[in-house]
């Protein structure tokens, strides 16, 4: 099943646009979990994990592109999976995508309650329980998503602009406060890092998730594999650079031993920002970090819930009337909000669970799709580099992530706390 190449538009979309779509999808509030989840392995090992994850996630994205090019422009991830791997794989893949969206919705309700509670407490002296803050946050976002997709688009655009400004200013402020002795943990010459390495993989994997947007880039650029692959390269490299800067800024400022206090405090966004404020003792930097964290959580929450909203509307065949959207909104927000009320400090655990499901649909499935695509089509337009060894590497990486999360959930892996 193939089609002729899409017609080249008179004015081709810019390479920057596609790159920003990839980087913007990958980078979100989940980055706040990274310093906490990787505090056990600290900076040097975390760089190695980031590089491995970036490489494997870039490869799996290229494999989706390879398979996608054999189908008409506009073919969805689900369509390609069903045709290449069969209905059974497609059902499991769809369930894993829904699981990721639901668990991330819960994560952002939890993270939103934490950072809103901290913001009100530190900025206005108002004490608001995290459960109530999370509930109000969920209601506000639900109202926007229910109202219209255009409302989400406009608000998210404003938030992204604010995020870029506040992140840039926050990082520039933190980089100047990095202490090499803290960054390289020279105060603990006998510290052991490697036992905590395996448990960090799912958190890192979640931070490089963009794979559902590869078919969208086909609509954006047409069948132009060189342009799409460059967008994947640039977008993922931007995400990698942001994460490395964030890791250096946090792990070079907060001593390793103090992360045990953050973990004991619930491992949430507000706790991390509070510790940074204590150490830097800068009200202006605290205001920037607090603003950035609020915007990051809110924009990620809007993006994820819009995706879940559209997915459920299509699955349940709800129409786009106000009542139809209301039914979809109930299905989208009620289950994760109940979870947020029952388990308000589940942000970092939810990110890990998202990594488990993402290991399936964003790593294992793309590798299997590339293998099936090569058997059927021979990949005449584009082939992800690395041949069969690359497919094996990506499959092993996906399985390792899934196993790591299962073992960590059973407490069979060492925990830094």
Curated annotation (Swiss-Prot):
Gene3D superfamilies: Amino acid/polyamine transporter I (1.20.1740.10). It catalyses: L-tryptophan(in) + H(+)(in) = L-tryptophan(out) + H(+)(out). The modification Phosphothreonine is found at residue 8. The chain crosses the membrane at residues 16-36, 40-60, 97-117, 126-146, 155-175, 191-211, 232-252, 295-315, 326-346, 347-367, 390-410. The keyword Kinase does not apply. Its main location: membrane. GO terms for cellular component: extracellular region; plasma membrane. Keywords: Amino-acid transport, Cell inner membrane, Cell membrane, Membrane, Phosphoprotein, Secreted, Symport, Transmembrane, Transmembrane helix, Transport. One of its GO terms (biological process) is amino acid transmembrane transport. It is found in: Cell inner membrane; Secreted. It is a multi-pass membrane protein. GO terms for molecular function: aromatic amino acid transmembrane transporter activity; symporter activity. The keyword Nucleus does not apply. Involved in the transport of tryptophan into the cell. Belongs to the amino acid/polyamine transporter 2 family. Mtr/TnaB/TyrP permease subfamily. This is Tryptophan-specific transport protein. It comes from Pseudomonas aeruginosa (strain UCBPP-PA14).
């Amino acid at each position: 099943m193939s089609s002729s190449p899409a017609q080249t538009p008179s004015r081709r979309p810019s390479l920057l646009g596609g790159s920003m779509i990839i980087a913007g999808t990958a980078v979100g509030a989940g980055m706040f979990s990274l310093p906490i989840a990787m505090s056990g392995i600290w900076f040097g090992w975390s760089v190695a994990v980031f590089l491995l994850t970036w490489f494997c996630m870039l490869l799996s994205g290229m494999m989706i592109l390879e398979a996608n090019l054999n189908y008409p422009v506009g073919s969805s991830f689900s369509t390609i999976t069903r045709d290449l791997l069969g209905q059974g794989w497609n059902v499991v893949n769809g369930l894993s995508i829904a699981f990721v969206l639901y668990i991330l919705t819960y994560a952002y309700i939890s993270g939103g309650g934490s950072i809103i509670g901290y913001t009100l407490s530190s900025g206005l002296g108002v004490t608001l329980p995290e459960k109530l803050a999370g509930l109000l946050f969920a209601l506000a976002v639900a109202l926007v998503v229910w109202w219209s997709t255009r409302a989400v688009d406009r608000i998210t655009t404003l938030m992204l602009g604010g995020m870029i400004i506040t992140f840039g200013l926050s990082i520039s402020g933190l980089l100047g406060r990095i202490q090499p002795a803290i960054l390289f943990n020279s105060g603990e010459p006998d510290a052991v890092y490697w036992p905590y390495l395996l448990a960090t993989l799912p958190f890192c994997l979640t931070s490089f998730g963009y794979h559902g947007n590869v078919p969208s880039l086909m609509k954006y650029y047409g069948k132009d594999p060189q342009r799409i692959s460059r967008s994947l390269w640039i977008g993922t490299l931007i995400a990698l650079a942001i994460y490395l800067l964030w890791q250096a800024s946090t792990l070079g400022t907060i001593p390793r031993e103090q992360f045990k206090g953050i973990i004991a405090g619930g491992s949430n966004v507000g706790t991390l920002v509070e510790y940074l404020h204590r150490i830097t003792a800068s009200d202006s930097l605290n205001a920037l970090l607090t603003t950035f964290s609020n915007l990051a959580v809110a924009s990620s929450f809007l993006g994820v819930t819009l995706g879940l909203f559209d997915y459920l509307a299509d699955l349940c065949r709800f129409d786009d009337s106000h009542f139809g959207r209301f039914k979809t909104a109930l299905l989208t927000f009620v289950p994760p909000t109940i979870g947020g009320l029952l388990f308000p400090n589940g942000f970092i655990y939810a990110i890990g669970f998202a990594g488990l499901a993402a290991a399936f649909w964003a790593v294992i499935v793309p590798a299997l799709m590339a293998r099936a695509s090569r058997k059927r089509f021979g990949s005449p337009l584009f082939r992800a580099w690395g041949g069969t060894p690359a497919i094996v590497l990506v499959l092993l990486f996906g399985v390792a992530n899934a196993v790591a999360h299962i073992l960590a959930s059973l407490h069979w892996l060492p925990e830094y706390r």
